[in-house]
């Protein structure tokens, strides 16, 4: 034991509404250096601050969240092709 911290990934399946990001989100996020890709809407009780979403075999990094008044959380993500996504 070297006292090294080894991070282990825990996966959880949840139902989500999946859409492309709006043009205005694409433009504003692009100005901040993000490359917006997809928006996922999940129930607030199912989201615990995770920074990575996997959908259809592709990993997306969460760059922004929004708690909607209907009890859901909107997860705005970017596709980091060829990059390591940090959890």
Regions found by a protein language model. Name each.
Residues 4-87:
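Short, conserved turn/kink motifs that form compact alpha/beta structural patches or helix kinks used as
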